[in-house]
């Protein structure tokens, strides 16, 4: 069964593309028709592409991989923040930091700087600074939080990127391409799908459109996370089973030995009484 259906996408306005004069010819395979100068996206292809992307994303989540969600446009940023956070994934909704992927060690240093400032606040070091120094550090911390706060748990390069509006986020896409990181993307009729590994043809300008696509993707990822959790519990149970069996055998052996010792003691006492009676 598909994760989204035609009517659901239609209601969310996923089919609305851009003006014909703004189209990218590479999107032709995903365009159904033109109406009043606007390209209409083939929603049956969108359904198929959502299912394909969702399955891959589910497997990534099941394997414990991290997917970085990227959306800095106003209509999408809050939806992406909420959906990504719901499955414990990092996201970028403010300006894309140049070199975020290609210069990842530098980004990690900036994140560690945030942790250092937090530590200063906790251990009292911050209180010993001058008023001016406190103000500078506080502003620096706020700036870092705004751009990097949502990726503090990203300790290594992500296994994939999910991008809303691949044209706007072309720098992120280019960095991922350079490093061979797979890119999932909502691609509108004005964008180039050629550098996107998993194309989801869809209206990337409407909040409802982003909501329905992200909802399906994150639902699949949540399933993957739940399956991973269940497998971990089963593995732990399987590991504990032999231990429990060994404990049970040891308890039986101990009980048997105790019984044998008791029987021997009783026999010894009985023999002594018999000898005394003689």
Swiss-Prot record:
Protein name: Small ribosomal subunit protein uS2
Cross-referenced PANTHER family: 30S RIBOSOMAL PROTEIN S2 PROKARYOTIC AND ORGANELLAR (PTHR12534), SMALL RIBOSOMAL SUBUNIT PROTEIN US2M (PTHR12534:SF0)
GO annotation, biological process: translation
Entry GO CC: cytosolic small ribosomal subunit
Keyword Transcription: no
Keywords per UniProt: Ribonucleoprotein, Ribosomal protein
Protein origin, superkingdom: Bacteria
Pfam families, per the entry: Ribosomal_S2 (PF00318)
GO molecular function: structural constituent of ribosome
UniProt xrefs under CDD domains: RPS2 (cd01425)
Organism annotation: Parabacteroides distasonis (strain ATCC 8503 / DSM 20701 / CIP 104284 / JCM 5825 / NCTC 11152)
Transmembrane spans: none
Family: Belongs to the universal ribosomal protein uS2 family.
InterPro entries: Ribosomal_uS2 (IPR001865), Ribosomal_uS2_bac/mit/plastid (IPR005706), Ribosomal_uS2_CS (IPR018130), Ribosomal_uS2_flav_dom_sf (IPR023591)
Region (Disordered): 235-278
Biased composition (Basic and acidic residues): 252-261
Lineage of source species: Bacteria, Pseudomonadati, Bacteroidota, Bacteroidia, Bacteroidales
């Amino acid at each position: 069964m598909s994760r989204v259906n035609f009517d659901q996408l239609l209601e969310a306005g996923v089919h609305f593309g851009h003006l014909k004069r703004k189209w990218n010819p590479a999107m032709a395979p995903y365009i159904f028709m033109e109406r009043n100068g606007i390209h209409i996206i083939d929603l049956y292809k969108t359904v198929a592409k959502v299912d394909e992307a969702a399955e891959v994303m589910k497997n990534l989540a099941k394997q414990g991989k991290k997917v970085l969600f990227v959306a800095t446009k106003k209509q999408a940023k809050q939806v992406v923040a909420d959906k990504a956070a719901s499955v414990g994934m990092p996201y970028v909704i403010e300006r894309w930091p140049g070199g975020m992927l290609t210069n990842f060690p530098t980004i990690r240093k900036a994140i560690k700087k945030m942790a250092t400032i937090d530590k200063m606040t906790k251990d009292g070091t911050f209180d010993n600074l001058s008023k001016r120094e406190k103000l500078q550090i506080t502003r620096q911390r706020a700036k870092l939080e705004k751009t990097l706060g949502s990726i503090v748990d990203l300790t290594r390069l992500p296994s994939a990127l999910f991008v809303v509006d691949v044209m706007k986020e072309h720098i992120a896409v280019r960095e991922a391409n350079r490093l061979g990181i797979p890119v999932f993307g909502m691609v509108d009729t004005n964008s180039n799908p050629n550098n996107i590994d998993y194309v989801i043809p869809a209206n990337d300008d409407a909040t409802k459109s982003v909501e329905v696509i992200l909802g399906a993707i994150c639902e699949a990822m949540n399933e993957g996370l739940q399956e991973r959790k269940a497998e971990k519990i089963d593995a732990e149970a399987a590991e504990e089973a032999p231990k429990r069996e060994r404990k049970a055998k040891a308890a039986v052996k101990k009980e048997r030995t105790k019984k044998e010792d008791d029987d021997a003691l009783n026999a010894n006492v009985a023999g002594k009484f018999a000898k005394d009676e003689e």
